[in-house]
């Protein structure tokens, strides 16, 4: 069903959504598609230039900035960049990466994207009513996107010092704590579907090392699963497998 909707929207093109009802339909789809593509590493037509231009025009025309629409666009851009980052680096022999102009260009582009993400947060912090659940959701996604984007650079050692976006441990911990706090508030005091929280919770869980912390994420995912979103179980299974791998790697490092 979701695939069929995607194809219909794609074939119609961005110019087909002139009415407010059509725009709401497209915006709802964008939120779901952004979550899907960033969690599973898939490509999306929403990252194509004509769809990005459409999104930019609609944001500029709004009387009040839509924080959900703008963070959704950043999720789509970050997901597309992530896919390209891995594809391009893997295509370069390892011994050539350190001095590759492609790698240098990726570092620069990644830094610029990180700046855009941070600028989004700065603009949102100036807006009123941070207690609004959709603002809270947008903030949870911001912290998750920042973790996701910066973590992607840690999988390679081909970067020159100071050329890539990085988070220190205090910043990582701050993002994770914020995600858990915001997701709990959203689940307990709003009607926002829990499935929309899966990406932030997955990113928070991926940065937890202690069992009591991981249980906190499990409990929130169980709440989402019990509310009818069975995909939460899949996310929990993925996290458990990741935690087992992470623990094995930590054990190997300690034994060396």
Question: Where are each of the predicted segments found?
Answer:
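Intrinsically disordered, low-complexity regulatory regions with latent secondary structure
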Residues: 220-256
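Amphipathic alpha-helical interaction segments
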Residues: 37-38, 59-60, 128, 237, ...
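A generic structural signal for nonpolar/aromatic side chains embedded in well-ordered alpha-helices
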Residues: 29, 117, 179, 234-239, ...
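Amphipathic alpha-helical surface "interface" segments used
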Residues: 24-31, 104, 133, 241-244
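Cytosolic regulatory protein-protein interaction regions
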Residues: 45-222, 226
């Amino acid at each position: 069903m979701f695939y069929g909707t995607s194809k219909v929207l794609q074939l119609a093109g961005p110019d087909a959504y002139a009415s407010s009802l059509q725009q709401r339909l497209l915006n709802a789809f964008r939120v779901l598609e952004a979550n899907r593509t960033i969690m599973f590493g898939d490509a999306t037509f929403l990252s194509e230039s004509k769809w990005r231009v459409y999104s930019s025009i609609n944001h500029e025309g709004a009387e009040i900035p839509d924080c959900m629409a703008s963070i959704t666009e950043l999720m789509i851009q970050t997901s597309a960049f992530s896919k390209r980052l891995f594809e391009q680096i893997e295509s370069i022999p390892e011994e050539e990466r350190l001095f590759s102009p492609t790698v240098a260009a990726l570092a620069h582009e990644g830094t610029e994207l990180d700046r855009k993400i941070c600028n989004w947060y700065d603009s949102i912090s100036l807006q009123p009513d941070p207690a609004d659940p959709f603002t809270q959701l947008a903030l949870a996604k911001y912290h998750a996107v920042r973790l996701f984007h910066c973590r992607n650079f840690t999988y390679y050692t081909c970067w020159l010092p100071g050329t890539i976006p990085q988070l220190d441990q205090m910043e990582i911990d701050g993002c994770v704590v914020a995600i858990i706090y915001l997701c709990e508030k959203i689940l307990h005091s709003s009607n926002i579907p829990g499935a929309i929280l899966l990406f932030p919770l997955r990113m928070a869980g991926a940065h937890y090392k202690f069992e009591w912390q991981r249980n906190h994420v499990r409990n929130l995912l169980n709440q989402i699963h019990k509310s009818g979103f069975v995909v939460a179980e899949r996310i929990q299974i993925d996290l458990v497998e990741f935690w087992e791998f992470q623990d094995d790697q930590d054990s190997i490092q300690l034994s060396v």
